[in-house]
């Protein structure tokens, strides 16, 4: 009698995301995923463009959803980046949607899908996250059920430089309201002491 084949859900998620079975984790990716999924730590990933920061949070999302965690919220600064992330997530079988200024007519449908737990990833801009209506109507339930909060391009939190966005600074208020065991990851290509 042969032994059952053991599968690695993280490797399967990475392969689905990459669209090929021979893909391997880069140094540090699996460790970041394990910190998020197994130890439920807050993680900062600082790596160059193209390293695979999004693979960390998409694989972590897949594993957390397999463990019955709620959806991931990704705070992302650019609509074009959100579109790219949604396409990548969907290739991996991750149900990703967005609420942003370009799809106002879809917000009610997205909110309903979130309420029915039919969304794995919600991408929002920092401005949407801090919108008073979103904070009162959507965020309380999302914060209660959310499996992971991702602050993508976290260098935008800095209050210095050309990339400053005031609503990124307000994310700290949201983080302060979350339980200390709440999974959070931040990704950036650059980081400094600020």
Where are these regions (language model features)?
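Conserved pre-motif I regulatory segment
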Residues: 2-48
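Post-DEXD/H (motif II) to motif III coupling segment of the RecA-like Helicase ATP-binding lobe
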Residues: 140-148, 153-194
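Conserved helix/coil segment N-terminal to the catalytic DExD/H
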Residues: 58, 103-148, 156-162
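Conserved nucleic-acid-binding Ia/Ib motif block in the N-terminal RecA-like helicase ATPase lobe
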Residues: 71-128
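Pre-Walker A (Motif I) flank of P-loop NTPase domains
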Residues: 39-45, 70-72, 118-120, 179-180
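ASCE RecA-like P-loop NTPase motor cores
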Residues: 2-5, 83, 117, 155, ...
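Conserved SF1/SF2 helicase motif Ia
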Residues: 46, 51, 56-95, 177-178
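Conserved phosphate-coupling serine/threonine residues in phosphotransfer and NTP-handling enzymes
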Residues: 49-51, 125, 185-187
């Amino acid at each position: 009698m042969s032994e059952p084949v053991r599968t690695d859900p993280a490797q399967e998620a990475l392969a689905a995301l990459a669209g090929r079975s021979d893909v391997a984790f880069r140094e540090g990716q699996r460790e970041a995923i394990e910190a998020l999924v197994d130890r439920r730590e807050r993680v900062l990933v600082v790596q160059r463009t193209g390293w695979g920061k999004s693979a960390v949070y998409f694989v972590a999302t897949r594993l957390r959803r397999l463990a019955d965690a709620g959806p991931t919220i990704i705070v992302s600064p650019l609509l074009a980046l959100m579109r790219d992330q949604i396409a990548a997530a969907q290739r991996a079988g991750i149900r990703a949607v967005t609420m942003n200024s370009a799809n106002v007519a879809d917000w009610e449908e997205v909110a309903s899908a979130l309420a029915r737990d039919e969304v794995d990833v919600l991408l929002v801009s920092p401005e949407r996250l801090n919108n008073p209506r979103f904070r009162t109507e959507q965020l309380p339930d999302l914060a209660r059920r959310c499996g992971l909060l991702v602050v993508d391009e976290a260098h935008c939190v800095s209050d210095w430089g050309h990339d400053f966005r005031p609503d990124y600074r307000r994310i700290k208020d949201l983080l302060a309201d979350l339980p200390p065991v709440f999974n959070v990851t931040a990704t950036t290509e650059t980081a400094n002491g600020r």
